[in-house]
UniProtKB/Swiss-Prot annotation:
It comes from the Bacteria. It comes from Pseudomonas fluorescens (strain ATCC BAA-477 / NRRL B-23932 / Pf-5). It is found in: Cytoplasm; Cell inner membrane. This is High frequency lysogenization protein HflD homolog. InterPro entries: HflD, HflD-like_sf. One of its GO terms (cellular component) is plasma membrane. Belongs to the HflD family. It is a peripheral membrane protein. HAMAP family: HflD_protein. Signal peptide: none annotated. Keywords: Cell inner membrane, Cell membrane, Cytoplasm, Membrane.
Amino acid sequence: MSPIQEQLTALGGVFLAAVLVDRIAKTGQVSEAALSCMLGSLLIRDPKDTLEVYGGDDINLREGYRALIGALERDPSTLQREPLRYALSMLGLERQLAKRDDLLETIGKRLPQIQSQVEHFGPAHENVIAACGGLYQDTLSTLRQRIQVHGDMRNLQQPSNASKIRALLLAGIRSARLWRQLGGHRWQLVISRRKLLKELYPLMRSS
């Protein structure tokens, strides 16, 4: 993978989280494999490459890549507006989080506890989802900027769906942080669209 493709893999994680949040909000449904991929990404430390963060291959990132391609191509027929809004909001929240050492410390202390739950129950277990959602509430929900999720109120009011949405937003912001660490910047999404798409199309085909 090229350095830009490493960035795009992490950005695909942001967009996958956004797509899954939108799907839960509108339908109440989510793929367990995709959910496990994103929640698992919270717990990987010192990966040998970006792909390892998402389980070693990018098959679960396809929907994230597709939404990212739609955003970069700016084609109204393929643009997923709500996921794009969520993804950009996650990139913005990551910038705010980076300035808050206290919140980063809280996240750093509680992720090992969640890791213990994953080892006991598995990554998509309701206890793990609730713990991740609670961590989001205690940290990122306290920031000035909030992510407003739109969908069917019947889905949004179910506690299990609310926990999944918060857990996915936490995982998406983790991917946004990884994207920044790999050299990603928001201006690239405007200025370097064609360059990004050229590197992204092969990822979409191979995943």
